[in-house]
């Protein structure tokens, strides 16, 4: 029994990931969503959550369950995903990871470093260091305590600079030492990458944004603002939401300006996704429509073997 096999399906925004799932046979698989914004409640339209019809057709996990004020990290995702895979396997179904958050897929494939939890006291301490002494001080400190990590990091990546120092202050051990121990939980992975031409993606992104507006995106945004969600709300970091913060704070930005910005940011994000996905090895790149039969055969041949 090939119980250790999982399937990854990834691709850029608007490539057509959700559409192919309607062709999957019922009761053969379950979907583990790989998206850092679709996890949030209330943020529905611009996040392109799976439709009710799709979720009725095939069970989805990690969608629409988290308070918008809560942070969602790769560590939380990874822990939840491993637990869900075990549950799906117990049902003799295929666990299929589907989404576009490339960073999550990287760690699913390569393993997630077993870095320790950090207390809020340590986080506050590091944030205070940043505010009082600045980024240059944090970089100098990181270079002293973990030169390996210092040389690896983008010096503008303040999140990972802070995270590296937090782990060191919590444990006294450089984060680079923890990362040496990482290895994947999955040994048998079918990896399918969905691709289209950039011209096709650009057209589909524009169509999707128009569909979002017709589905009530503006009303959703106004409702979110009325509930007090703002630039400090983690869910507002997503494309299609973040741009409306400008609309709220700067009256000079009209709705057409915001729509244009969403279009631009979505396409740039799609290009970044493809650049990141291209670094992942052992991927079968297929077209979501032209190669649909091949996709179904690749996935559900697994079903015949378990």
Curated annotation (Swiss-Prot):
As recorded in UniProt, its EC number(s) are 2.5.1.75
Bilayer-crossing regions: none
A GO biological process of this protein is: tRNA modification
Region labeled Interaction with substrate tRNA — which residues? 35-38
Q: Which reaction does it catalyse?
A: adenosine(37) in tRNA + dimethylallyl diphosphate = N(6)-dimethylallyladenosine(37) in tRNA + diphosphate
NCBIfam families attached here?
A: miaA (TIGR00174)
Kindly provide the name given to this protein in its UniProt entry. Answer: tRNA dimethylallyltransferase
């Amino acid at each position: 029994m090939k119980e250790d096999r999982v399937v990854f399906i990834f691709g850029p925004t608007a490539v057509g990931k959700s559409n192919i799932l309607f062709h999957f046979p019922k009761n053969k698989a379950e979907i583990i969503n790989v998206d850092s914004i679709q996890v949030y409640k209330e943020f529905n339209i611009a996040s392109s959550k799976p439709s009710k019809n799709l979720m009725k057709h095939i069970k989805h996990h990690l969608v629409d369950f988290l308070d918008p004020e809560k942070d969602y990290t790769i560590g939380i995702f990874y822990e939840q995903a491993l637990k869900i895979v075990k549950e799906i396997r117990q049902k003799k179904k295929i666990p299929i990871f589907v989404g576009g958050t490339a960073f999550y897929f990287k760690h699913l494939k390569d393993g997630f470093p077993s870095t320790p939890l950090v207390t809020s006291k340590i986080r506050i301490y590091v944030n205070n260091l940043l505010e009082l002494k600045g980024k240059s001080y944090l970089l100098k400190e990181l270079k002293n305590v973990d030169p390996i990590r210092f040389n690896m990091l983008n010096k503008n990546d303040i999140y990972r600079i802070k995270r590296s120092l937090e782990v060191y202050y919590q444990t006294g051990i450089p984060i680079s030492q923890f990362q040496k121990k990482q290895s994947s939980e999955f040994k048998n992975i079918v990896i399918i990458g969905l691709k289209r031409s950039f011209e096709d993606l650009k057209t589909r992104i524009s169509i999707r944004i128009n569909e979002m507006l017709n589905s009530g995106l503006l009303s959703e945004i106004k409702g979110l603002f009325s509930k007090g969600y703002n630039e400090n709300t983690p869910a507002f970091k997503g494309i299609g939401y973040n741009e409306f913060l400008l609309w709220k704070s700067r009256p000079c930005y009209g709705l057409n300006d915001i729509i244009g910005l969403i279009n631009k940011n979505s396409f740039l994000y799609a290009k970044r996704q493809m650049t990141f996905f291209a670094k992942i090895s052992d991927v079968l790149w297929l077209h979501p429509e032209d190669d649909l039969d091949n996709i179904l055969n690749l996935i559900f041949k697994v079903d015949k073997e378990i």
